[in-house]
């Protein structure tokens, strides 16, 4: 985006401004929040993934959660964001340690003593020798050495300056623990600056005293911020917000202390009394900590972390690192989405941007928008039992996707031709329309050629080239109705052999084709395992695999017969998808019974009942096609014999081609 210094980047400049500032334009990445030119959330891809998980047996709520965790082809998921969060946390602990302030104090102390020794070496008086003895007797502990040198009369100006830097450093580090950025802000500060800090702490403690007693007013807070607002870049609007920001930082400072060894704590406690040359600062901070712990007991005041790296952090840096770690742990929990009522809206986008950058926040925001869009646009419904379900709109979209995949497979078959002819499909109305996949109406040759000629009018060609976009078909008023029974095997072997999803996608594709292109046809989906039952496309989509014995094709054929008899005037079609021999049957042939007989290998009675079921389909005049999955020789023998008996067809597709085989067979029948 082009920017001109001092201009609103979203407001076009006047011609005169553009002319006078032509060479001051700068181009850079957009940084004003979410990309305004970014494409909308891809719900089609998201819904397809949710549908795959639901068909595999997950609940819609679980499928949505898994989608948000995985992400999509163009969108980072919550799991990857959480992995980045955990990686950053590990790096903070692995690369750093909390010894920085003590190391810096020891360095300044060594420099001060060395400079003083050099100065004393040039002196010849007895006082210089006595001073050397004092320096030789300094304790190894930096804290005790600093205390003993408090009354020492320095001869070297450089040494005195180094020693004063120690007290100044301690004061700035202590303040930096509670107020981020104070170490740098007070570098080279004057006595007046230090007095202003002390005055701010006194006024802050007085304000919190009044708040604890319930005597403070908004005016008290406003007056405090008017006087000391420069110390609070977070710009709190009231005392409660002020307490929130201060308590988070103070709790991190306490965790810093908890993470130190006992020796380090003792050293820093002793050194803290020398901050800014007196214990007053430490007393004010202790008073502030007491207020904050009482006001915000829910903060983590007792936690600690184990740092193991070589990079030394000072007290302020270490406190910030512990605050970052706490924020990262909170983000990891939010991104895990593993708690009751979890939602991507729970993720703190500002914190995520601070820790991982703006792109991570954009990804998380997009995931939240995706979650809301799926609900708000009607793809997920909550039932009366409180459970989420795929809505009819979602089912149509899934069916459309499944049918599109099938159409691509059918169009990619080499050496096949679709021969269409008018007749039984219906009476011509005289109107035409563009061809769509699944149409059985005859081409309107005149309109098709006209479209091809007009499309190529601007170019010179020796011949007319016809594309799919040119084709128009003649509309018809009526169409012969078909009664279609799709029998799908839902026994556990379908799950174990990875045939579950292809079977469901096949049923969805056929259901969508019938509902959109052959609305007069009556499609009934029948699922059969130990028992058979009629199911809707939505019920089949959400059907979970159950381990139970039995492939009751006999029961399924009985239900198919009922469906065909209900539509006696329609042309009957029976499509069977199965991967195993019939091993169960109903003891009541009419399909009303609940007593199931099971045996393996298939019992002759089961075979006989199933064959009679196929005979019933033949008596009804049904066109029967059986789609055999797998290479079970027993099933192959049985299916081949039954197909010859009822003059049906046997198709042996691979799993990827199952949908194309079933839909293609149905279309072949509709074109007869």
Curated annotation (Swiss-Prot):
Residues 1-10 have a biased composition (Basic and acidic residues). It comes from Mycobacterium tuberculosis (strain CDC 1551 / Oshkosh). Transmembrane segments: none annotated. Residues 1-40 are annotated as: Disordered. This is Uncharacterized protein MT0986.
